[in-house]
Design a protein with these regions (language model features):
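Flexible helix-coil transition and linker loops at the boundaries of alpha-helical arrays
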Residues: 32-33, 76-90, 118-128, 157-167, ...
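Structural register within alpha-helical repeat arrays
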Residues: 45, 96-97, 135, 169, ...
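Helix-turn-helix repeat elements of alpha-solenoid scaffolds
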Residues: 62-78, 102-115, 141-154, 185-201
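N-proximal helix/coil linker or "cap" segments that precede and/or mark the start of modular domains
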Residues: 228-276, 288-291
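Short active-site neighborhood of thiol/selenol oxidoreductases, capturing the structured segment around
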Residues: 284-310, 314, 328
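Thiol/disulfide oxidoreductase modules built on the thioredoxin-like
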Residues: 289, 361-363, 369-427
Length: 437
């Protein structure tokens, strides 16, 4: 997860489809229709450079290298930042300059600019709020340390005391909530998510639309905590409330609905896991129906760091409960790459999967491998999955699903919270003790 994204991107940018590559022309080529002069203009130009350049190359039918475009954007930010000095810019320009320094990968200067702005006597509440939310974002820049998180929390507390700063407070708590979601600290996800939800209820319809992505993220984050606590009814309730609260922001509803659909699966009959290729399964296996066996399914991928962190606990779970009837299945798919290897054939990637899952991680349970989804959209997008991930409404991985002997879904967990191991052990023990009929 890129924790600095919400801070840096005035317009959200997505990396290109896997495999796109080329050496793009110089930044001076065609992406500067007018030369920016003010700090704000330079910040905007640097923030939007990579996305605008990507669009130009696509329109020209050319491929591109996103990492290279990002490097060019950093170089451009450095050029712009060098035009200004903390000692001489107007007070109102200090926070935008700090943001420009972050884009230029000069965090020390960014901190100096923010510190000067916050120390300026008589600044307005609006300026103070902007400076404090920027301070949160700068503190949470990569790499994130425990001390930096404490500092960001302190800035957010100061920001909470500023009047008429709802949008900035939402941004700060969204950033912190996103960080805790990434490292799966449930109590903190819950705390910051609920703060954002409460703040959102006081916004005007226009402000709700402007902060829709952050507001929807708060509802989904809180719901996923409830889901991991075996409280799917509360997860559904908070998501339905989110749809109602954000009715003036249709894009938020679209963001919430997939998570709502996922938790509505709890209590329903689980779909079979199907794949043309399996590891650790008898030859000819094409489908496994979980009905009749207590089953844990994890959706995973060889590139997923957070998935990898679940493997030791899932192996321990398997070793403890498989002799008593637990079935564990991993579900993944082909991606056309593995590690630094690119443009792999299905056969090559499957061999790589064997080494990764069976040798490197010594996973003893069955692993379903679906085929690769191929990009078909004009923008390089892939079509929605119609396989296992679609049946289980997978949005992010790892996603763990626990199914009882009657084939009903009893739990859905998204993420890799270390506390999940104890909860999963208790649930599996309880399900194995339930009557078989």
């Amino acid at each position: 997860m890129t924790l600095l994204a919400a801070f840096l991107a005035a317009v959200p940018l997505a990396p290109p489809a896997q495999g796109a590559s080329a050496q793009p022309p110089s930044p001076q080529a065609s992406v500067r229709p007018t030369e920016p002069k003010t700090v704000a203009e330079c910040l905007r130009a640097a923030q939007t450079y990579a996305g605008r350049r990507m669009q130009e190359l696509r329109a020209a039918g050319q491929t591109f290298n996103w990492a290279k475009l990002s490097e060019e954007a950093t170089d451009l930010a450095k050029q712009y930042a060098a035009r200004f000095a903390i000692a001489t810019v107007a007070t109102a320009d200090l926070t935008p300059l700090a943001r420009l320094y972050v884009l230029a990968k000069q965090p020390g200067l960014a901190e100096q600019a923010i510190a000067k702005h916050l120390a300026t006597p008589g600044i307005s509440d609006a300026e103070k709020a902007d400076a404090l939310v920027a301070a949160v974002d700068i503190s949470m820049g990569s790499p994130v340390s425990d001390e930096a998180v404490k500092q960001a929390e302190a800035y957010a507390t100061r920001l909470d005391a500023v009047k008429d700063a709802g949008r900035q407070q939402i941004q700060a708590h969204s950033h912190l909530g996103g960080y805790y979601r990434g490292v799966d600290v449930d109590d903190k996800i819950f705390e910051h998510g609920n703060k954002v939800i409460a703040l959102g209820r006081g916004l005007t319809p226009d402000d709700k639309r402007a902060t829709a992505t952050m507001l929807a993220g708060a509802y989904t984050n809180v719901a996923e905590v409830y889901g991991g606590w075996e409280q799917a009814d509360k997860a559904i309730g908070i998501l339905e409330q989110g749809v109602k609260d954000l009715e003036s922001a249709p894009q938020a509803k679209r963001q919430i609905e997939p998570t709502l659909e996922r938790y509505r699966l709890v209590g329903t009959v689980a779909a079979p896991i199907e794949a043309p290729r399996w590891l650790n399964a008898p030859a000819g296996t094409m489908k496994i129906d979980p009905k009749g066996t207590v089953t844990l399914v994890e959706f995973t991928a060889h590139w997923c760091t957070w998935c990898r962190r679940t493997y030791p606990s899932i192996v321990r779970l398997h070793n403890t409960w498989a002799p008593k009837g637990l079935q564990v299945i991993f579900a993944t798919e082909l991606y056309g790459f593995l590690g630094q290897q690119r443009a792999l054939t299905p056969g090559q990637e499957i061999e790589g999967d064997k080494k990764y899952f069976l040798e490197e991680h010594a996973l003893p349970f069955k692993i379903a491998i679906e085929g690769r989804r191929v990009a078909t959209g004009p923008d390089g997008s892939t079509p929605p999955s119609t396989g296992n991930g679609d049946h289980y409404k997978v949005g992010g991985i790892p996603q763990i699903v626990v199914i009882d002997r009657q084939g009903r879904i009893r739990l859905i967990i998204v993420g890799s919270d270390p506390a999940s191991e104890a909860r999963l052990n208790k649930l599996v023990e309880r399900l194995l003790a339930e009557p078989t009929t």
